[in-house]
């Protein structure tokens, strides 16, 4: 899985969030 922003790539599913410093990322996993 990867932490991405602003959105997950097509073909990936968001399963949660990551926080790095004061920035939130989406936790995206490939199916």
From Swiss-Prot:
Keyword annotations of the record: Antibiotic, Antimicrobial, Defensin, Disulfide bond, Fungicide, Secreted
Q: Which domain of life is it from?
A: Eukaryota
Does the entry annotate any disulfide bonds, and if so which pairs? 1-29, 3-18, 8-28
- Gene Ontology BP terms: defense response to bacterium; defense response to fungus; killing of cells of another organism
Q: How is it modified after translation?
A: HANP-2 could be a product of proteolytic N-terminal amino acid removal from HANP-4.
Q: Which InterPro entries match?
A: Alpha-defensin_C (IPR006081)
> Which compartments is it annotated to reside in?
Secreted
The Gene Ontology CC terms held by the record are: extracellular region
Q: Which family does it belong to?
A: Belongs to the alpha-defensin family.
Q: What does this protein do?
A: Bactericidal activity, greater against Gram-positive bacteria. Low anti-fungi activity.
Task: Report the protein name in the record.
Answer: Neutrophil defensin 2
Organism listed in the record: Mesocricetus auratus
């Amino acid at each position: 899985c990867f932490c991405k922003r602003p959105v997950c790539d097509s073909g990936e599913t968001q399963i949660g969030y990551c926080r790095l410093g004061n920035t939130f990322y989406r936790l995206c996993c490939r199916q």
